[in-house]
Every structure is written in structure tokens, then in C-alpha cells.
């Protein structure tokens, strides 16, 4: 039996998918722009 692949970790999740991580790259900023355009209430995982 293999182990479960999803091992939740809040810090790693925020470091990878958080607001500052999105702002750090051009593509990340594009993600934020499209989520804003769509009207998402939560832009990133750090907006709890």
C-alpha cells in the first residue's frame, strides 16, 4: 500500500500559492488579474 500523496502543510501551501508568490512572477500577476476580472472573492489561498 502506497502512502497518500497529499500531506497538507499551511506554510508550504501559502509559499507556493499565496499572494506574494503570485506577485513575484509575471504569470502569477496574470493569474491574479484574471481572477479579479472573473470576480473571485478569494484571489489566493492567503485571502482567508
Swiss-Prot record:
This is Large ribosomal subunit protein bL34. The keyword Transmembrane helix does not apply. Gene3D superfamilies: 1.10.287.3980. One of its GO terms (molecular function) is structural constituent of ribosome. The gene is rpmH. Belongs to the bacterial ribosomal protein bL34 family. Keywords: Ribonucleoprotein, Ribosomal protein. NCBIfam families: rpmH_bact. GO terms for cellular component: ribonucleoprotein complex; ribosome. It comes from the Bacteria. InterPro entries: Ribosomal_bL34, Ribosomal_bL34_CS. One of its GO terms (biological process) is translation.
Amino acid at each position: 500500500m502506497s502512502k497518500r500523496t497529499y500531506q497538507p502543510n499551511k506554510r508550504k501551501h501559502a509559499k507556493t500559492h499565496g499572494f506574494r508568490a503570485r506577485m513575484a512572477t509575471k504569470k502569477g500577476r496574470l493569474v491574479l488579474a484574471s481572477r479579479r476580472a472573473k470576480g473571485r472573492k478569494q484571489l489566493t489561498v492567503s485571502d482567508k
